[in-house]
Amino acid sequence: FRAKEIQWQNLGNGDSILKNGAENIHVALESSSKKSLDQNTQRPSLDNGKTIHFQGGDGSTLILKDSINQGAGALYFNQNAIVRAENNDTTWLGAGIVVNGDKTVHWRVKNPINDRLSKLGTGTLYIDGQGKNLGDISVGDGTVVLDQKSFNGQQQAFNQVGITSGRGTVILANNKQVNPDNIYFGFRGGRLDVNGSSLTFHRIQNADDGAKIVNNHRTY
């Protein structure tokens, strides 16, 4: 899907529409009507959600008009992009975000409490929304920059940050992005760049070797 500005509207009943003015594309979402069919190993309600690939529209903006639960569907970005919500409380859930190559996606959408956003791909996910986000993130590849802005006196990029696989890097723009005690290193660890910020850890959670905490002072 390629366009300079795309609006994403939740139509309900497991359906949504992407609009760019000249073209409309329907995208299936998580379907509550299929929850009665869910079992331990099969979740038709989540499987109803489809994946979207964005490419060819470098610098485009995706605007969420409503909260989206994409279920088992993911977002793949083969281009630079901005993703934002029309309302600061609008949320996105799905199978994850993949930013490929050397591309950068500015992500300005929250995820709900108890939800864990999964980031893959060698590109950069730049978190620069507003206010306090209650969701979590798991970084398995590429770079994630946490630069959430203050809104109404509240500021937090994620409640919990996990770095896994040894290929992920998380960069902090400042010490307001996440509680240091809620940062953990999973299988094969990864890299946390405190980026000149002063942090106090009461514990460092690591499930494997490969965890690195570095301080490369960048300006954002």
Mark where each language-model region is.
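Beta-strand-rich extracellular passenger or scaffold domains
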Residues: 1-220
